[in-house]
Regions:
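Transmembrane alpha-helices and adjacent helix-loop boundaries
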Residues: 1-217
Length: 217
């Protein structure tokens, strides 16, 4: 491969950025609601469910995401002799990211829910348990946990680079390949700028949401 211009590098890296953005969006879209379900399991009065969920969260938070991605990708073959094609790489990335981040969001939800005072207003309004949760508790919980969620979301932007583990052509993988072929650091510099702008946009968006939800400001 001949020497590339900066514009050519940016064009190739933009394609990788699209994949990184896809990983980011899919992860949030599924891990946020899944995390709430897992939080309910973590707070369940059923000891078996509570124990299973605690073990799951402990494993997800106590082992590297990179390792989890490899288990999700290679697991079907090593455990069940199910052959998977290269198209499964991106799906394995989605699955690995979702189950990992859902565990973190579950603990954030749990701490937010358990910090809420229980039920006097709900009793006055005559709400049942489900109505109390969705109409009174959850909106307040979201306000309380948003800073913690923001931290995880910003971390997710950077973690998308771990998809290179499964040879997914996201931005970091492309930057690494270009840096090797072009024998210079410019692809990494461009990738760093992309990541910084992505994180800046996310931070501004989350700050805007936080202000919108702050009814008392």
């Amino acid at each position: 491969m001949g020497k590339m211009t900066l514009q050519q590098m940016i064009t190739q890296l933009a394609g990788g950025m699209a994949v990184s953005t896809q990983i980011f969006v899919i992860t949030l879209l599924f891990s946020l609601p899944l995390g709430l379900v897992i939080a309910f399991g973590r707070m369940s009065k059923n000891k078996l469910i509570q124990t299973i969920v605690k073990v799951y969260i402990s494993i997800m938070r106590g082992t590297p995401l990179m390792l989890q991605l490899m288990v999700v990708y290679f697991g079907p073959y090593y455990l069940f002799r199910i052959k998977v094609g290269s198209s499964y790489r991106l799906w394995a990335t989605f699955i690995g990211f979702v189950i990992n981040y859902a565990a973190y969001f579950a603990e954030i939800y749990r701490s937010g829910i358990q910090s809420m005072p229980v039920g006097q207003a709900a009793e006055i309004l005559g709400y049942g348990k489900a109505q109390t949760f969705f109409k009174i508790i959850l909106p307040q919980v979201i306000k309380r946990i948003l800073p913690s969620v923001t931290n995880e979301v910003i971390t997710l932007v950077k973690d998308t680079s771990l998809a290179f583990t499964l040879s997914v052509a996201e931005m970091f993988s492309i930057a690494k390949a270009l840096a090797a072929s072009q024998t210079n650091m410019m692809p990494f510099v461009v990738a760093a700028v992309f990541y910084y702008i992505f994180n800046l946009v996310v931070a501004v968006a989350m700050e805007w949401i936080e202000k919108k939800l702050d009814y008392y400001r």
